[in-house]
């Protein structure tokens, strides 16, 4: 008689979880901005005089991993000419199981009451000036940010703060100033390589006292 060994419940659950993950291949789409999204952006995040028109932007939808180990659906508004390349980047991040905390349109563009209380929103397009280093004061540089063109992404801003002269404007991110102790959601060399594969640079590689660890862009600035 052949004996059938019963697997421990924990092992069964682990196998099932791994099977579920394996059955969820990466997927992504790119499409023009829907009418409602155009309306939501107009006035607060886009206005006449911005360096790109709404028709030059695309809605990028991607699968990504959350901090809880589940697969989620995230969305970004990005420049039309960069959308397909970014699909490849997020596929690589998915394969790395790199966690992204918040990446929904309502997190970025919704009313203040609907945004995550802790921030940490991964986003791309926003018609605004570049933000000066924490080393200096002020809220704008007088120059368009790469975000104003949809050609930059800020990835997990809490875990990857904008740092200048050893400090950051986000007090909650101060515990991530020490980049030698790697924690979930922090940018790794593999993440940098995913973006560099399409020619994008990383703010964490800037020389001098200012580093923008969240920031990836077509120009590297």
Identify the role of each PLM range.
Residues 21-70:
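N-terminal module-boundary/linker segments of secreted carbohydrate-active enzymes
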Residues 52-120:
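Active-site acidic/histidine clusters and adjacent loop/turn architecture
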Residues 137-221:
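Catalytic cores and adjacent binding grooves of peptidoglycan-active enzymes
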Residues 1-22:
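Secretory targeting and sorting signals
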Residues 104-148, 160-162:
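Active-site-adjacent loop/helix surface patches within enzyme catalytic domains
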Residues 41-48, 71-80, 86, 135-140:
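N-terminal post-signal-peptidase region of extra-cytosolic proteins
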Residues 65, 88-99, 128, 158-161, ...:
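Structured segments of extracytoplasmic/periplasmic soluble domains
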Residues 62, 125, 153-155:
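Long, contiguous hydrophobic alpha-helical segments, chiefly transmembrane helices and signal peptides
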